[in-house]
Amino acid sequence: MTKEFHHVTVLLHETIDMLDVKPDGIYVDATLGGAGHSEYLLSKLSEKGHLYAFDQDQNAIDNAQKRLAPYIEKGMVTFIKDNFRHLQARLREAGVQEIDGICYDLGVSSPQLDQRERGFSYKKDAPLDMRMNQDASLTAYEVVNNYDYHDLVRIFFKYGEDKFSKQIARKIEQAREVKPIETTTELAEIIKLVKPAKELKKKGHPAKQIFQAIRIEVNDELGAADESIQQAMDMLALDGRISVITFHSLEDRLTKQLFKEASTVEVPKGLPFIPDDLKPKMELVSRKPILPSAEELEANNRSHSAKLRVARKIHK
């Protein structure tokens, strides 16, 4: 049975308006999720325009088919059930050589967090899962119970930036010697045991960073985003745009770096002009990230950490 997707779209108008949508253009929503961005983008297209929507979660696609039904009936939407790291290959299969714009809403979606059985949330007791693609083999259970101490420390530091990574990895090792760690609640309690009292008093759940680290590892989120954003920039038509929403510093740093590399060039001294093959292919539409408005922050608590970066194709 299809579960309802209750998802408040973050930075909805900013993300799509910054794409400067051409009514007859070809667009991609790389992270379909609750279909809010897709629906708003489609409202700006004529019947000659087309949207390709990616998601590796069948539940998201099932719900989007209902929400976007009027546009589907007009033949304006193609759903692609796959990880967006395969963006270029899947679009080529569909006969698409270039696109006029693409948007990303990175990270886990609100419905995935809210569905207890998906095992993403430290606030709800559930089996350790955290797979965005439920057909994938690697789960949070595998990471927590089978990764050795050094691998746990590596991902906790790298993806969670938690200063207690070593102590938490050691405590996990000790706990699983007694019995496997099977649920989100068990893991959260182990993490709490490690954190000093002053850390537990801080705003935010003490397990947040470790859960983020495990989720990123399970889904290879940063690796997939890196590959996909580079493919997207390659596929953009001249004057095409890319919008990327991030929710934590790792995603934002990655996006900022990819945009910087594509929009700057190191020209050897003494060259009278910049050769075509050295010209930057992108330019930043906004130098600083776009943040949610005060009204959105008040209405949607999950928008607090959101940042939007936008770039435009200026050279093929």
UniProtKB/Swiss-Prot annotation:
At the top of the EC hierarchy, this enzyme's class is transferase
Give compartment(s): Cytoplasm
Question: For this protein, what is the EC number?
Answer: 2.1.1.199
Task: State the Gene3D superfamilies in the record.
Answer: Putative methyltransferase TM0872, insert domain, Vaccinia Virus protein VP39
Q: Which GO terms describe its cellular component?
A: cytoplasm
Q: Keywords assigned by UniProt?
A: Cytoplasm, Methyltransferase, rRNA processing, S-adenosyl-L-methionine, Transferase
Q: What is this protein called?
A: Ribosomal RNA small subunit methyltransferase H
Give the organism, scientific name: Streptococcus pneumoniae (strain 70585)
